[in-house]
Amino acid sequence: MKNNLWFKLSGVALLGLVVLGLAVPRGQTETTVTSVTLAAVVQDQQCQGGDNVNVTLTATLNPPQQNVQFQWDFNNDGIFDTPLSPNPMVTHVYPDETNVTAVVKVVKGRRSATDSVTFSTLRCEN
């Protein structure tokens, strides 16, 4: 009987830890259950005739997540230039020899995270 009582008490203690682990502190509106790292990366740049560069940007999540959507702001003006999409990769045409900061936002449910990448575009020969 002692073993049964201990087992029941252990179950209650464990349940209490789970509830405490998920409780939202007063004044906060969001709980982070897992830590996720978002990274924006320039995957490729290619001159596209004249003074334009076709830039491929991608976002990665570590650890990988399902049911997320990505949105890109190509010039860091605070306005996202793409609709939400499950595809983390986009292409955009920039002028050559330009310093650029692009921002990616990842959304999962009501949670979101952002990251930016700053880079210089290639010099294209006319």
Name these PLM-found stretches.
Residues 2-13:
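Bacterial N-terminal signal peptides that target proteins for export
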Residues 8, 16-126:
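Extracellular/lumenal mature domains of secreted and surface-exposed proteins
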